[in-house]
Amino acid sequence: MNRFICVLALSGSAVLAGCVAPPPKPNDPYYAPVLPRTPLPSASNNGSIYQAGFEQNLYSDRKAFRVGDIITITLNERTNASKGANSALTKTSSNSIGLTSLFGAVPNTNNPLGDGDLTLNAGYSGNRATKGDSKAAQSNSLTGSITVTVADVLPNGIIAVRGEKWMTLNTGDELVRIAGLVRADDIATDNTVSSTRVADARITYSGTGSFADANQPGWFDRFFLSPLFPF
C-alpha cells in the first residue's frame, strides 16, 4: 500500500511539473541581432561611385531596407474579448398502461394482504431540467517600444524583423520579444513603425524573479485547476 501511494505521488508530481511552462532564457539564437551581409566583390572595378545593392532613391528618406538595419517598433497593443453562453433544457414525460386481461385470461386480483384489489395497471412519469450560464471576459494592454534588426528582405520587398529586449530589475528580469513582417511603406522617416502594422506578429512579454513567481499558482493549486481534477 505504501509503495502504491509513493508511485501515485511521484506520478502526480511528474504530471504537474510537466504543466509548468519553462521560464524564458536570454540569448535565444533566433532573436539574436542580425549583422549586415557582406557584399560580394564586383567582378570588375570600373571606378564608379555607384555600387550594386546599395542604391537608394534620391527623393526618398533614409529608411531601413537592408539586412542588419535597425527599426524601432512602437508597441501599442490592446485587446478586449468577452463571451457568454446561456442554455436551458426541460423534458417532461409520462405514460400509463391499463390491462384487464393477460393472454386472454382475467387474472385473480385478490390481494392476499386484504388491502384492496391488485391491478395490472402501470404508469410512470419523469421530469428533467438542465440550466447553464457562463460568462468570460479578458482585456490586455501593452505599450512601449523595442528596437529590432532586419532579419531578411523578401523578394516582394516585405521586411522580416525580429529582436528582444531584456531589462534587469531589482527582483528579476523583464523580457519583450517580437518578430513579424513589415511593409517598407509603413516605416516612418525616423525608422519607427507601429506594432499594429506588423504582420504575423509574435509578441512575448514575460519575466523571471520573485514578482513573476508570485503571479503563478502553486503546484497544489494547479492540480485543482488542471483537467486531472475530476470535479
UniProtKB/Swiss-Prot annotation:
Protein name stated in the entry: Flagellar L-ring protein
Lipid bilayer topology: Lipid-anchor
Alphabetical GO biological process terms: bacterial-type flagellum-dependent cell motility
Annotated localization: Cell outer membrane; Bacterial flagellum basal body
Lipidated residue numbers (S-diacylglycerol cysteine): C19
Lipid-binding residues (covalent, N-palmitoyl cysteine): C19
Cellular component terms per the entry's GO annotation: bacterial-type flagellum basal body, distal rod, L ring; cell outer membrane
Domain of life assignment: Bacteria
InterPro entries, per the entry: Flag_Lring
Lineage: Bacteria, Pseudomonadati, Pseudomonadota, Gammaproteobacteria, Pseudomonadales
Organism: Pseudomonas fluorescens (strain ATCC BAA-477 / NRRL B-23932 / Pf-5)
Residues of the signal peptide: 1-18
